[in-house]
Regions:
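A compositional/biophysical signature of low hydrophobicity enriched in polar/charged and small residues
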Residues: 1-167
Length: 167
């Protein structure tokens, strides 16, 4: 099922308010509730929509003395071959504290953003990552302050050739 302009409009509406009712999303995008419901289920089946979760404000939690310990982790795989990078990425992605995991362009290095309850938990996470066979090195940079946190992802134009997931 290709993603069309209506799907993009639905995704954008849900990124603005993931708790919006299907009726409100339908009004926003100019479609029927039935159509929006069908499209949302289709986007879930495709894995484009992976659930609806609350966004916690690190800034507000910090103001209440409950700030999570956020850290950027630069992970160097043991092998710079494609398979080695994929093995390292799969291993790092299994860690529950890792919120985001990216492969950086022009390098075999991975960038992980993680969130733990304390520096002690972060240190344990780093040790755990360093003990993974497909990981050669982990470099950490603690995040001092969060100025913006909003994981809005614009949906780009259709590509002529879509790469396969995991390829």
């Amino acid at each position: 099922m290709p993603i069309d302009p209506l799907d993009v409009a639905i995704l954008n509406a849900l990124q603005v308010d993931g708790r919006a009712s299907l009726r409100r999303v339908a009004r926003t995008v100019g479609a029927s509730v039935t159509t929006v419901s069908t499209r949302v289920r289709g986007l879930e089946r495709l894995g484009v929509l992976q659930g609806f979760v609350p966004l916690l404000s690190v800034q507000r939690l910090a103001a209440m003395g409950r700030s999570p310990h956020c850290v950027a982790l630069f992970v160097r795989p043991s092998s710079s071959a494609r398979e080695g990078i994929e093995r390292a990425a799969r291993a790092v992605a299994r860690e529950p504290a890792v919120c985001y995991l990216f492969q950086l362009a022009g390098t075999s290095e991975l960038l992980a953003l993680a969130s733990t309850r304390s520096e002690r938990e972060t240190a344990a996470l780093v040790r755990s990552l360093q003990d993974l066979t497909p990981v050669a090195r982990v470099r950490t940079i603690p995040i001092h302050r969060v100025h913006k946190e909003r994981p809005n992802h614009p949906v780009g134009p259709a590509l002529a050739a879509v790469p396969e997931l995991g390829a």
